[in-house]
């Protein structure tokens, strides 16, 4: 159920204008990596009752902000993992969506790369655009 929620929140973030364009690449390249990160994290909690309290946030951020969803402890409210997507625009190379995550271990400072998906030479719409 946690992994289904991760997928649902991702497509909510993409909105109806971005999702159809990147859906196949996302499901093939990025989503399996997100699922592995979450599964590996949960495996570290198997002997801990905190495992039961791990949930996914239910509202991605719209506009140009990066948040897709957070994995957090519903009892303490503490974020454990944060999954983000950033719009990159390398010179003369069109627009890319860079998927990455942050962990509580380092105070969410380091970017852990999941991969990038090419958009187009034209500016992508805002997140959650209909």
Task: For every predicted segment, state its role.
Residues 5-25:
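Acidic/histidine-rich, surface-exposed loop or edge segments in extracytoplasmic proteins
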Residues 117-129:
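Short, low-complexity, Pro/Ser/Thr/Gly-rich segments in the mature regions of secreted, periplasmic
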Residues 79-82, 114, 118:
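Local beta-strand/beta-hairpin segments that build beta-sheet-rich folds
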Residues 95-112:
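Histidine-centered catalytic micro-motifs
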Residues 87, 101-103, 119-121:
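Short, solvent-exposed aromatic-acidic interface loops
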Residues 20-92:
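Mature extracytoplasmic domains of secretory-pathway proteins
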């Amino acid at each position: 159920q946690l992994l289904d929620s991760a997928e649902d929140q991702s497509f909510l973030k993409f909105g109806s204008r971005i999702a159809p364009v990147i859906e196949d690449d996302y499901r093939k390249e990025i989503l399996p990596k997100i699922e592995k990160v979450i599964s590996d994290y949960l495996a570290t909690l198997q002997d801990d009752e905190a495992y039961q309290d791990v949930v996914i946030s239910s509202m991605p951020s719209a506009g140009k902000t990066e948040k897709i969803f957070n994995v957090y402890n519903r009892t303490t409210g503490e974020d454990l993992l944060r999954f983000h997507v950033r719009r990159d625009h390398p010179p003369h190379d069109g627009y890319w969506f860079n998927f990455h995550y942050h962990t509580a271990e380092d105070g969410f400072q380091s970017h852990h790369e999941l991969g990038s998906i090419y958009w187009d030479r034209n500016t992508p719409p805002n997140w959650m655009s209909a």
